[in-house]
Amino acid sequence: MEVWKLLASVAGSLALIIISHFALKLYQRLWARPKKIEKQLKELGFKGNPYRFLHGDMKEFFAVAGEATSKPMDFSHDIGARVLPYEHHIVKKHGKSSFVWFGAKPRLNIMDPMLVKEILSKPDDFHKVYPDPVADLVVGGLSTAHGEKWPRHRKIINLAFNLEKLKGTLPEVYLSCKDTISKWKSLVSATSGFTEIDAWPYIENLARDMISRAAFGSNFEEGRRIFQLHEMQADLAFQFMGTSYIPWASHFKIKEKKKMRVLNQEMIDQLSRIVKKREETVKRGEEVNKDDLLSVLLEATRKENQEEGSGMSMEEVIDECKVFYSAGADSTARLLIWTIVCLSKHTDWQSRARDEVFQVMGKKDIDFEKLSHLKIITMILYEVLRLYPPAGMLLRATSKKMKLGNLTIPPWVHLTMPVIFHNHDTEIWGEDAKEFNPERFSQGISNATKGLPVFIPFSWGPRTCIGQHFAMIEVKMAVAMILQNFSLELSPSYLHAPELYFLMRPQYGAQIILQDLSATQ
């Protein structure tokens, strides 16, 4: 009996020690450390709300965000308060040098362009937030890679996005655009020359078809299931974000995590079939498009394995294919839809762009070599990227004490670079910063920005978006072909509601009135 009492006493003591240790860790993580960092940040000159246990600013964050997205706004390009509502509220309340409590972790608003440049120039010191298992599942690949994996993958994938290689994909991009033009012409012809459509689903499918053809020699129909899986993963990930600031909260979302893994495995299986089918085709000696992204990626990793032994494994190749499908289509669709909205609103610029297309290309098929001569369309795309940057904000983290300019940033801090605030800042861009004026880019980006690193729609530095040139080529071709065939006008039913759902999208669609130019000639 005495032995059992002794064992029970020891077990009780061990349990008490474990509970005390766990309670101390919780206290350190959820109270002592945040309060210590809060004091340090205020000493650095940053202002924000006092830390509130566990939730920080998040209850207020969700309330403000919910209110902002509950209704559309009057048409204006001054969209910061709707796209980043709580950050806008905090900057207005506390100034540019401010912070938000994302649970127990502070997020500093970095508004100084030179500090943004320094952060993005040092990806090892100011790194992406990891581990981030949700992001790894939804996107993965190069976009979330870090450590030795990132430079190894970047070196190989760079070959696929070489400008000369990209030219080989343009015929596929052209076919995708031609299919969409044909669909729109059929709709217009059925309604005596003009009709109203919601352009957003068409543009989403066009972007998906372009990346399917250019990357895999496939098309949207064949890749439809992959895009459906990506959408379902994104919806689940968005739900995770609501409690992601609470430590260990994800461990209790057992059902959601299981579903996420099932979706991810099905996507991997779908992509594996595409990759293996391509490999078998090559082995049989059948002709394939050697310039599509998958062919270049497989060839580059094969050579790297032979020469350096550091190529990508088949699992890593499939992971990068997932990025092609998801990020590749999403960013292109966002840029193209906001370009259509802006041109439908600012018909003077639409006319100027169309005149340029007819002057450079004529009314026949697109000449790929002449895409670079479309200066006005390039100016328009830059202005759309400035006003409606796909990402809206960039996020980096510190895991140790870091020097940033004259500041010493403590560890366990996130750094938020609200791109949309930079892009709409009148101190940087002038009094018309919130107006649509592509003319500001008439002498190029450097002249428009006065040499400052303030135009970063595709990020900046070593981790700049590797597919940005491809996205610009895709959108430039699509815009040119649309303007060759149609005039565009915003419908009275259009509701202006930019929304940051991972990337910026039109919450209620993009209703435009299409008129077939051939019907008016």
PLM region spans:
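Short, small-residue alpha-helix embedded
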Residues: 332-343, 478
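N-terminal membrane-proximal hinge/A-helix region immediately C-terminal to the signal-anchor transmembrane segment
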Residues: 2-138, 146-148, 152, 174-182, ...
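Conserved cytochrome P450 K-helix E-x-x-R motif and the immediately C-terminal K′/meander segment
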Residues: 62, 72-95, 269, 273, ...
